[in-house]
Amino acid sequence: MRIGFDAKRAFLNNTGLGNYSRDTIRVLSHFHYNNRYFLYTPIKNENPRLSFIKDNKNTFIRTPESLFNKTLKSYWRSKNIVKDLFNNKIDIYHGLSNEIPLGIEKTSIKTVVTIHDLIFIRYPHLFRTIDRKIYYTKFKSSCERADKIIAVSKQTKKDIIEFLNIPEKKITVIYQGCNDAFKSIVANNIKNITLAKYKIANQYLLYVGSIEERKNLLTILKTLKELPKQMLVVIGNGKSYKLKCLNFIKENDLHDRVIFLSGLSLEEMSAIYQSAQLMIYPSIFEGFGIPILESLFSKTPVITSEGGCFSEAGGLNS
């Protein structure tokens, strides 16, 4: 079987959607080796987290070929890619990040789309109006046209039915996993080297995730203010909300107790997870919450929110 993936996030994103895309490709190409896997991406970035495909003789990378498609990469990904899929004799196409291309439903290619969350509908004030309209159009259209929908949690399945009016029988819940790097014990010398490299003390709290309003990092910082000498390590990045957090840190003289990191290798992340006292994940809402899973596999306790998907990611049966 020849399986195509929308692999843009796998190449260009090192957070949630990228992790999901890479892990899906990695697991399928390893355990179902007789298939042929085609990774379609508008840009082929060298991403060390995709190093496994170099040894895979069953995995191939495809990028836009014509000058038109190279120039209008978004148009290629959302529509013109269908011709390439047909020419490559793709049997199944999997939209790994909430969408499938227009017109694919008119071909013989079977389609699967993974929907991660509908946060833009639940919390509209966190998104620009134009972005909400684009997301709604893409998500709903993709769900209606796809042969099968994967929801990453029961909460996401419920939202797809409620907000997009999609029949339940079309949706299957398949929980996300996490990279094997978090399932292996990191040697003490590697932990020590990593902590020394980033000037991290031995006793610290950990936050992992993008730095945006719904993730609620500011709540951790306000609590940190009441915990003298407690250190916090933040792995993630952001824009306006990060500036808000940085201002709070400056105003409350917390700059020597908070360390911001990004662009870490999986080995470094594993070492920091496993060395932490606990991981705090106070997000308002998620589609799943991979950092919870990464922390549990790292044998590090987690404090997270109630409701939504959090009991699925970190509950008794997680």
Segments predicted by a language model, with ranges:
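Carbohydrate transferase catalytic cores enriched for Leloir-type hexosyltransferases
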Residues: 1-318
